[in-house]
Amino acid sequence: MKKTIWMALIMLSGVIVSAAQPKFTQKELAYLPATAQVALFKAGIITPSDVLEAQIAQVQKYNGSYNTELRDLGKELNTFNAGKINAICFDRFAEARKAAKAAEERYRNGTARRLEGVTVGVKNENNVIGWRVDMGSLLLKDVPPCTDDTPIIERLKNEGAILVFSTTVPELYVNCMTWSRLYGITRNPWNLAYGVGGSSGGSGAALAAGFCTIATGSDMGGSIRLPASMNGVYGFKPPFGRVPTSEISYETLGPLTRTFDDLVLMQDIIAGPHPKNHSSLRPKLDYPERYRPLKGAKVAVCYCNQWLDGGCDKEVNEALDKVAAALKKAGAEVKIIKSDWSVQNGEMKTFVAGLLSTEMYELFDAITSANKNLLCANLVPLLTNISGYNPKALIKATQMGMAAHADVQKEIFEDGCIALIMPTLATPFVAPAYQATPEDIAVVNGKSFISNDILLTPVWNLLNRYPVVDMPVMLSSKRVPIGVQIVGNTFDDLAAFRVAAGLSKVIPQMYTGDRFPDFREQK
């Protein structure tokens, strides 16, 4: 308690009393938020090397080995790194140690930048000069190193961040959990019997395990929000164009962090127009550190039980109950809605066909002539329907999105609500190698699922001008976290951030007290 109060005083006042300086344990250093780290670095209490070494120790203890030979793990899927997190493709710890020493010099000479010395896990999708981006696929294991930086990587580097490792992804980013024949299964630090979400699952798991301080993600069907929810971290799917990404309107890059304040900091750094990306929005939106209280605001809450045959898991409903109560405690008016503008069931196929009829088609068309025996099992059905990915499919998906947009506007935002809160997925209890075999399933209220219908995220990629914050709200009975989506109106990022900020003050936060992963394995 004394240490917590002391840290708060450091961060708020900048007053340092050297006699009161506490020692930090390895775990405390590994899980320190970026905002706290920077304050303590500036004060000379700890150094970037202290945090880096603590996080490397976490990796060595909990991650397991790397598949450095890039061999096919298909027959070893369940045994490779069994009992470990397995969230890292490869590390760059030698370079990181040098960067940490350079950061310490900047703190000494007063030239430290906003993320000086803060460690970043990089999704195996973002270009980093000299790093390999193989998309988790055996087909691409011999890809040459990158010769340029993705814009968000460029911006993180320019603010002094230290890139420490590449995080695991499902093959070609096409799975809601994270496993591949190239890197194996990534498991949940809160409970290794369950999945971490996807496709930014390695980033989410690395944060939860204390391997890094912040991490990059991307989202074209829920790939930031699913890992955020299942790993108990914050994630943000910005509206299309807010962060320079690709020209695929379903997709966006975004931040993953353990705290709301770190989410604000990272998003403010990576947002804004960039000459490499003509769809990036101008001018840059600035994200303030503080937000107005929720008193008097009207917020819609949808439990989404009507979106899925049999409804959502009872613990997901319990999480929404907690959110509704927290909103009222914060002084907000709550509007419960029961509308269904989902993309579940048959409409999920329309969404997927629309997505794969964008620039994604070129990728899938190219691999149809590749060795399909090297592909993960879940990808093969997508390739058998390649002729169905065409302009007509894209138009059909667009029309479905326009109808959903009209419904959302009428029921939520035209009625005075500043945001909508809804679940991220129908259950937190999903097999870590979901869809690898008929046994790798999810069970919701006694019903078995192996489809993407358990996901409640894709509608906001179809409607990708809506910003969505995903924040953790409770631990389930099996200690797998449950998060919710906070959806602002089109391009109204700050409304979603305002609601997340308000809830973060009244809902007990992860990575405080006894709310840390214990790396159990319990079904």
Predicted regions: what they are:
Residues 110, 115-141, 293-304, 353-410, ...:
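Short helix-loop capping/hinge segments that flank enzyme active sites or metal/cofactor-binding pockets
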Residues 1-21:
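Bacterial Sec-dependent N-terminal signal peptides
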Residues 234-321, 507-523:
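A short helix-breaking turn/cap at a secondary-structure junction
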